[in-house]
């Protein structure tokens, strides 16, 4: 039986600081806690996990291109680049592998500048405002899609 390609979880700028960064917005879990949770969920569904974070837009674009070749699906929290990066939106549009956009906070309840996302239109789905639990929900959704 061919083994499934891993799920990629890609994180953008400042998410390396989770745990200490604005805990009233993002809670107390660190990125490493989130990675452990994602790995357990992915493995429970029979997937491997590739979990990455970058503060650099171009690196995230490169990883989305890689994902098109080597991933089953992508969970993407692009941080503030969500609201500014046409290049990331174009990268999501350019690849065939499904991308689930995740935000820890409810961006629609925050400043107006956070209401627009370059990623939402080309994304396969969006999970917003469920705290760090959103990453696991995205992995469960990907597993459900690919089972059916
Ligand atoms: C975020 C929301 C963005 O507006 C913000 O810039 C982030 C985190 C979230 O997960 O809630 O860095 O993507």
Task: List where the protein language model places each region.
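A charged, well-structured terminal subsegment
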Residues: 128-148
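Short acidic/histidine-rich motifs immediately flanking catalytic phosphotransfer sites
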Residues: 67-74
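Extreme N-terminal starter segment of soluble prokaryotic enzymes
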Residues: 3-7
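Short glycine-rich anion-binding loops that position phosphate/pyrophosphate groups of nucleotides
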Residues: 13-15, 79-82, 105-107
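Active-site-proximal loop->helix
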Residues: 88-91, 110-119
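Glycine- and acidic-residue-enriched helix-capping/strand-helix junction motifs
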Residues: 18-32
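Short, acidic/small-residue loops that bind anionic groups at enzyme active sites
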Residues: 93-110
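Short beta->alpha junction loops
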Residues: 48-58
